[in-house]
A protein has these predicted regions:
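P-loop/Walker A NTP-binding region and its immediately flanking N-terminal helices
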Residues: 1-178, 184-198
Length: 204
């Protein structure tokens, strides 16, 4: 049977992990992030590095949600029930901002994002800014971003993601906690596909 592209995309969204424990193949890393949520010891900037499709953006979203959760679990996961978690799930969160630098890499894009950093969050403790493919920012945009990164407001956390760590300026690297994501193993991929197949009632 031929499936159209829409169905593939819907499946990818349907099975995108929503908790740290459902992320495949990054156990050590997700444990460290959960511990940061539990202890409340959060850095102002994180850099998630690794090849495409290993869960960098997914983990950034889960982490952002957990940081702003009003009742995180004892394990450091977001509760999924509080107003902050619900707002995030319904894509109406005023505390979590995402920028895809692959298509929004001009100095204007970064400046408008940096304007948002000045305003404290209405609900919750932090404003979290996820910048995907951060290596794609223009040099002028990098410099505009660096000004805020050097002296971030107390209520701001940046989560940057990149597939090309070597293209990130050393001045930015030195201000981030760096997390290197593992490549997916064949075993992890097979076990995840079996899990999805079972849920979809597909025999294999």
């Amino acid at each position: 049977t031929l499936y159209n592209m829409e169905e593939y995309i819907v499946s990818a969204r349907k099975y995108r992990p929503m908790t740290f424990d459902s992320v495949v193949g990054q156990k050590a890393l997700t444990t460290t992030l959960k511990n940061a949520v539990k202890s409340g010891k959060l850095a102002h900037a994180y850099l998630f590095c690794g090849p495409r499709g290993v869960g960098k953006t997914t983990c950034a979203r889960i982490f952002a949600k957990a940081i702003n959760c009003m009742n995180p679990t004892q394990d450091g996961e977001a509760c999924g029930e509080c107003e902050s978690c619900k707002a995030f799930a319904e894509q109406r969160s005023y505390n979590i901002f995402e920028l895809d630098a692959a298509s929004n890499n001009s100095v204007e894009h970064i400046k408008s994002l940096m304007e948002q950093t000045r305003i404290p969050p209405q609900v919750g403790k932090y404003k979290v800014f996820i910048i995907d493919e951060v290596h794609m920012l223009s040099s002028a945009a990098f410099n505009a971003f660096l000004k805020t990164l050097e002296e971030p407001p107390a209520h701001v956390i940046f989560i940057l993601a990149t597939t090309e760590k070597h293209k990130i300026l050393p001045t930015i690297l030195s201000r981030c906690q760096i997390y290197d994501f593992e490549r997916m193993t064949v075993e992890n991929t097979i076990s995840h596909l079996k899990n999805v197949a079972q849920k979809e009632g597909i025999t294999y």
